[in-house]
Amino acid sequence: LRLSREFQEALNILEVARLQFPQDEMVAKLLAHTYLDQGKLNSAAFILEQAALLNPKLQAEAAEIYRRAGRFHKALTLNESIDDQKVKFKQRLSILLALKQYERAANMESSLYRTGLLEDQDVRYALAYALFSIRRYPEANKHLDHLKNAELFRKGTELRRLMEVCKTEPWQCT
């Protein structure tokens, strides 16, 4: 029913199944994804958050959906208990940037390095952006030097241009 886009019918069946089989992870996942298909991010995240009490591996997915829903503090709270360090740190970096907590994001550098996440071009650019945002330009430049991806290289070039503007005309960068 979900695949045929008969969402209400699917929701009715899955909600009943969830009440009858509250421990069934598959029912919870199907229900959450049906809500996702309808753009009901908070409902989907809440269901996965409850399912994560039985299977902690679902914690990252619930946190990600809360992040996409704009509930960054809730996402950050769930993120704290994710076991997979790579998933945890990559997600935390994106949440901190969304919250404009650039200092905290920049302070993740050693953790990102230790877990090998700085090999990921998107993570490296995100870290450079955080460093730029707190005016640590030399460190931001160091990370921008490693970008090879064409789109990220273009963004890095623009960030470098903005750094020059901020150095010469600091009043434009408040």
Listing of model-derived features with the role each one plays in the protein:
Residues 59-121:
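Alpha-helical adaptor scaffolds
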Residues 118, 139-174:
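Terminal, low-structured helical/coil segments at or just beyond the last alpha-helical repeat
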Residues 7-12, 20-30, 42-43, 51-61, ...:
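Generic helix N-cap/helix-start motif at coil->alpha-helix transitions
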Residues 16-17, 47-51, 78-82, 111-113, ...:
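Canonical positions in the second alpha-helix
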Residues 3-4, 33, 37-38, 68-69, ...:
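Register position in tetratricopeptide repeats
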